[in-house]
Design a protein with these regions (language model features):
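Alpha-helical assembly-interface signal, strongest on the long, hydrophobic N-terminal helix that forms
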Residues: 2-72
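Short, conserved structural patches
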Residues: 2-3, 52-135
């Protein structure tokens, strides 16, 4: 009985190494995926905050497009995000709602998946709308 138990343990010695070799790439892929999803979520949150700050500035002051774009770039630069496009739509004087719209776009660079030779970018966009506060 003792001899068969010892031979069973010796015959299963390499199983842990083989199982680890099979599971490790999957663990790496999952951890890289979680990291990239977190980075994309953070970038989207930064774009939303930048659009919100820009539309706040445009809503409480006279809609000055260069000033709004500068404010949006300031928020994005603080978080090391490079916006590819900033669109400011001033309020229409004939519209009773007088809404101001700011849209910010950026390309998200996928970093971790370069191991799999995917070097693409994912376009992200955030839009904020507020009513212009004027008398």
């Amino acid at each position: 009985m003792a001899r068969s138990l010892i031979s069973f343990v010796r015959s299963n010695r390499g199983n842990a190494v083989v199982e680890f070799a099979l599971v490790f790439p999957l663990l790496l892929l999952v951890s890289f995926g979680i990291t990239e999803f977190g980075r994309a979520w953070m970038t989207m949150n930064i774009l939303t905050s930048a659009a919100r700050e820009g539309v706040r500035l445009a809503a409480v002051t006279a809609p000055n497009v260069p000033a709004v774009e500068a404010r949006v770039r300031e928020v994005c630069d603080a978080a090391n995000v490079d916006p590819t496009a900033i669109a400011v739509v001033p309020p229409d004087p004939m519209d009773p709602d007088r809404r101001v719209t700011v849209t910010v776009q950026a390309d998200f660079q996928v970093f971790s998946v370069r191991i799999l030779d995917f070097r693409g970018t994912i376009p992200l966009s955030a839009t904020s709308v507020m009513r212009h506060e004027s008398l």
